[in-house]
Amino acid sequence: MTEHILSIILFAPFVGVVLLFFIPNEKPTLVRTTAAIAGLIPTLASFYLLYAYDSAAGGYQFTEQYVWSKDLGISFFLGVDGISIPLVLASSILLFTGVFISWHIVDRPKEFYIFLLILAAATIGVYVSLDLFFLYFFYEMSVLPMYVLLGVWGSHTKGYLEMADKQKRDSVGFIFNFTSNSKEYAAMKLTLFLSAGAVVALIAILIIYATSGLNTFNLVELQAHGQVPDYLHGLLFLLIFFGFASIAPIWPLHSWSPVGHAAAPAAVSMLHAGVLMKLGHFSIIRVGYTLFPEATREWMPLAAVLCVFSIVYGGLVAYFQKDTKYVIGYSSSSHMGYVFLGMAALNVMSMTGAVLYMFAHALATGMLFAVAGFVYDQTHTRDIPSLGGLSSRMPFITGIFTVAVAASFGLPLTVNFIGELMILVGSWEIYPVQTIIAVLGIGLTLAYLFRMMRGVFYGPMNPHYAHVHDASPFVDRLPLLVMAATSIYFGLFPSQFIHVIQAGVTPLIAAIQGAGPVPPAGGPF
């Protein structure tokens, strides 16, 4: 079983998809149960990966390789290291919990779960692929289910619905993307942004393939024996960076993300913010850092500049939002700036923190979106000024939201605190100005999340929502408890996680530092 564990993790959702095709629509309980099992299997297997990975040996482990096309140099090559294991685990957890968060969907639940499983499997495929062809294949595969899930099961914003003239509201929504968007617009914008970035990354991958002299997409062979001309390294790194940064998303390539968050169903928002956005960071590390260490050292100061705009801009815009999902969406864009800061500092401490923070953010934002979705299902509004006082009717949901808020701003005892602290400590020596701004950004996080908490759960209660009820004992509470407990557990006992991540980060940073010292703060900018 161990030698095929990555295949089990990757293909369990796909097997679930096949089984769902044969289940009649008239049996929704069986549909949901099948989807839950398809999410549970990779979750349990991913926890096994974390504790079975040999940190002392490091490198890629649990590898599987099957030649797909010898002439083209394409192989189905799977493997994980300390960088990918946390993200595989996050993807699996959010798939499993997302199935339960979506338990009450009544509009074509079978089709919804089919696309949800495909989305999760595609993200896992990116994280476990050691062949550039399949890494890109799974990356592109993630776009289609997102488009369908947003366009079919998504929701319009309040501003869009309040505009009487449909033709006018569509035109306004297309120009001003803050409050007047349709779900179709959100789906199309997300698809266009991600596809455009993917094309840029594809150009880089094809140039690597054509100039490496190896006739292979195998990342391990390209890293060890690739002969890409030195004069192309900088260009290829920039193509990889901006191609994949569009999904990360870094400012100014971020505008699709909050729109997509607002339109998506809760479970899709969880996967979107929790793992889909991390495809960008991971792919930059896996392809750009691995193949072009010297170009990484020369150009990552650019990310140190852009990440400040992401942190501050995302936080400020989040503070002034009235839609709960827009607050969380811009919050996610802001927090991804911390990941880029950790990546830009290029030392073991900051990079370990960046990878750990990606996992931590997946859990925290998963809880936030799950709670926002539950409140919306009960009240049919995401308008913060219209809500208030729900804590008296939803004590459990309020408690989970409090844990999520605490995790989001990095309260001790949550895994977010460990990751955030490592990023700030690791980046201080290289980028002190950016680090100070990042610390101030934590204050912004407190401000907009406390404002949202007060507006939704405290203060006078709107009598229009006196009928709402708390989460049901099992279906609604289980996924929230899983995410909260995991965040707190790894916040209390982070050593195993840190050792695994450092096993993947340390040789990568050594290769980059071997190319020369990291440029001073700001680099050439």
Where are these regions (language model features)?
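C-terminal ends of transmembrane helices
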Residues: 17-27, 95-106, 148-161, 247-262, ...
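Predominantly late transmembrane helices and immediately cytosolic-facing juxtamembrane segments
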Residues: 251, 365-369, 434-469
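Structural signature of hydrophobic alpha-helical transmembrane segments
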Residues: 2-12, 80-91, 133-145, 233-244, ...
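Juxtamembrane/interfacial segments at transmembrane-helix boundaries in multi-pass membrane proteins
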Residues: 54-75, 158-192, 198-254, 259, ...
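Helix-coil boundary and interhelical linker segments in multi-pass alpha-helical membrane proteins
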Residues: 1, 124-132, 285-299, 339-356, ...
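Central hydrophobic cores of alpha-helical transmembrane segments in multi-pass inner-membrane proteins
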Residues: 7-22, 36-49, 88-102, 119-120, ...
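Transmembrane helix-loop-helix hairpins at membrane boundaries of multipass inner-membrane proteins
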Residues: 1-5, 19-100, 104-114, 218-224, ...
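Alpha-helical multi-pass transmembrane bundles of energy-transducing inner-membrane proteins
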Residues: 26-28, 111-114, 118, 122-228, ...
